[in-house]
Amino acid sequence: ALKTKGSALYLLGVRHDALGGSIVARFVGGDLEPLPAIDLTAVHREIALLREGYANGIVLGAHDISDGGLAVSICEMTFGARRRGLGVRIDSCERWAKDVGSAGAWFGEAGGFVVEIAATTAWEALARKHDVQPIRIGDVTDSGRVVLGESSFDAATLFDVWSAPLRGFYDATEEES
């Protein structure tokens, strides 16, 4: 869950213009596209960066990019903080994924992480040490909204939609809504 209004959000991991194997691809007919390539050496460096960042108090939180891509990962980060009124503002994908189409940027399931950072200068220095190029994509806000480029959604409404299929299976889900 998001921790602090005003903290920076960074992307680790390259976005690809491929939707192969993704949830979105199943709906738009692209499920037979190739899967995005995985650079295991880069992933190893990213995880080492996250571990040291957590140990030094620089990283406030992180979320993997997987099912549903970056857009879903960002939404999931807001769910635990929605009652505190926290939200996010993420820049247009044309800024942080210049050579990738918007579908691949937001919904491609190439690995990576969204990272909430307390101190950007220390984070960027630590990233250089680990030979990782994080990209600042946005900020944590007190708007209670998830703003993805030009699209804006109420975080509580997103949680209700996301958690609806779970109601009745998990008591905590009913209490949260």
Model-derived segments and their meaning:
Residues 1-38, 111, 119:
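Mobile "lid/hinge" segments at catalytic clefts and subdomain interfaces of large enzymes
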Residues 31-35, 44-47, 53-177:
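Glycine-/charge-enriched secondary-structure boundary and capping motifs
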